[in-house]
């Protein structure tokens, strides 16, 4: 069994990670660290786990007793922890924050988007889990970058559920504000854009265009629905072939002929992609569950690869559908 520890156990991504790991046939949770909840039962915070988890939060860190450590911490906290603690040499780390997503000679974290860096992830000791918007958008663009087709600015509009803002209440997360409402935030300056550009340039070294990304807050709890527009004269049939070929060996990305909707991916680790051609404009529709394919599900996917397991183990999940 893979023995796992979690640091930062009280948030939405941690809750989803716990749910996945307790049902994973090859994994045992050794500890869930949360200084603010130490001593409390996991079910005091993640109430949906009644009858499934009898663990309690702890402020202890028995790193020598685990094989893999997940960070579900606020941005900046993973880096502080890594710099202030003695990490066992063989301990594998999966960081769900943004601290190590951008490549640097100062760290050895691999960018953990399996559809881009599968081989590197399989042999990695440290993996940086991609951001939720970044995952959804990149999966819509990677095949085009592979074929050197991203030579102009890309227009992206994407709407995310309220869980994307995290568990801590804020002015835009209250039900009375969020329900039956929409709003734009961080237009053209979202923090996930640099990691998107990094990945596209990895496949297409000549890529120097802009990702004109406008994020929206939606009034639903979970999921990301993105539309991307790229100019190209290549026929739709050829583009579909490129996408199907690129993702042929990936278990969680599916190219769909019919139009897609969010409920087809919510509560799954899937990404669905639909392609349309309108004159010289290629419309790419990409959707994921922000907490699963965009966070905890992808983290478990990376763990499976790092420990040489079949990539879908523990991730065959039922979509909500209705």
From Swiss-Prot:
It is found in: Cytoplasm. Its main location: cytoplasm. It is an enzyme of class 1 (oxidoreductase). Pathway: Amino-acid biosynthesis; L-arginine biosynthesis; N(2)-acetyl-L-ornithine from L-glutamate: step 3/4. GO terms for cellular component: cytoplasm. It catalyses: N-acetyl-L-glutamate 5-semialdehyde + phosphate + NADP(+) = N-acetyl-L-glutamyl 5-phosphate + NADPH + H(+). One of its GO terms (biological process) is L-arginine biosynthetic process. The active site is at 132. InterPro entries: AGPR_AS, AGPR_type-1, NAD(P)-bd_dom_sf, NAGSA_dehydrogenase, Semialdehyde_DH_NAD-bd. Coiled coil: none annotated. PROSITE patterns: ARGC (PS01224). Belongs to the NAGSA dehydrogenase family. Type 1 subfamily. PANTHER family: N-ACETYL-GAMMA-GLUTAMYL-PHOSPHATE REDUCTASE, CHLOROPLASTIC-RELATED, N-ACETYL-GAMMA-GLUTAMYL-PHOSPHATE REDUCTASE, CHLOROPLASTIC-RELATED-RELATED. This is N-acetyl-gamma-glutamyl-phosphate reductase.
């Amino acid at each position: 069994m893979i023995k796992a520890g979690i640091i930062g156990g009280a948030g939405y991504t941690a809750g989803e990670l716990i749910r996945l790991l307790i049902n994973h046939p090859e994994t045992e949770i050794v500890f869930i660290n949360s200084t603010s909840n130490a001593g409390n039962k996991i079910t005091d915070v993640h109430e949906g786990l009644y009858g499934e988890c009898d663990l309690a939060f702890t402020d202890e860190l028995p790193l020598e007793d685990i094989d893999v450590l997940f960070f579900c911490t606020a941005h900046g906290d993973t880096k502080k922890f890594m710099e202030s603690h003695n990490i066992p040499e063989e301990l594998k780390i999966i960081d769900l924050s943004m601290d190590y997503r951008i490549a640097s000679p100062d760290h050895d974290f691999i960018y953990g988007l399996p559809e881009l860096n599968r081989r590197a992830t399989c042999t990695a000791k440290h993996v940086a889990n991609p951001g939720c918007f970044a995952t959804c958008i990149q999966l819509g663009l990677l095949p085009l970058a592979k074929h050197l087709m991203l030579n102009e600015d890309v227009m992206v509009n994407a709407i995310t559920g309220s869980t994307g803002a995290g568990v801590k209440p804020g002015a835009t997360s209250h039900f009375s504000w969020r329900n039956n409402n929409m709003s734009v935030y961080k237009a053209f300056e979202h923090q996930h854009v640099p990691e998107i550009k990094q990945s596209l340039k990895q496949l297409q070294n000549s890529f120097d265009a802009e990702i004109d990304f406008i994020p929206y807050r939606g009034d639903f709890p979970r999921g990301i629905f993105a539309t991307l527009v790229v100019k190209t004269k290549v026929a739709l049939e050829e583009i579909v072939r490129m996408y199907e070929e690129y993702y042929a060996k990936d278990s969680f990305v599916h190219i769909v002929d019919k139009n897609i909707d969010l409920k087809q991916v919510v509560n799954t680790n899937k990404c669905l992609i639909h392609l349309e051609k309108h004159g010289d404009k290629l419309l790419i529709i990409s959707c994921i569950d922000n907490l699963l394919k965009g966070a905890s599900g992808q983290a478990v996917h990376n763990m499976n690869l790092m420990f040489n397991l079949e990539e879908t183990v523990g991730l065959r999940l039922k979509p909500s559908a209705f």
